[in-house]
Amino acid sequence: MTDITDDTGFKQALQGLDHASQRLLAARFVESVMSLATDDRIGHVIAVAARPDAGETELTEVLHSARAATLACHTRCGSEGDWKEQAGYFVARAATAAVTPEGKQFGGPAWQAAMSARMAQTARSIDTDEDCAGQERLSQYSLLSDFLNSR
């Protein structure tokens, strides 16, 4: 039984997963912050990413959608420092990471999605004065442990 308790173990465990497994896990990480999404396209992107049978053509299509949503969210953030919009931007980045092809990003899709999800929660923390990012990190450890133990 695997129990992830720190970022070192978290990253090592992620590196041991194949790309398809990382995509499925990345989708779970994004699902945990979906309430912070500010673009409706993200839900469809993650629905596709979460399917084990998602084909390359479909993944490419939703990657374009995720990138467009990320750009739109980034534009909405503006110079005002709207932390809710910042959170939405990071959710879009996490969704983009989940469907990015193999070898195109440092650390793989699950790592990038996890870090962007934490950034989304950091933005929420600034807006609400709660420790949302710390809770997200622990939730990710649990999601990964459950994922590994179910295999």
What are these regions (language model features)?
Residues 1-151:
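Structured binding/interaction patches within domain cores
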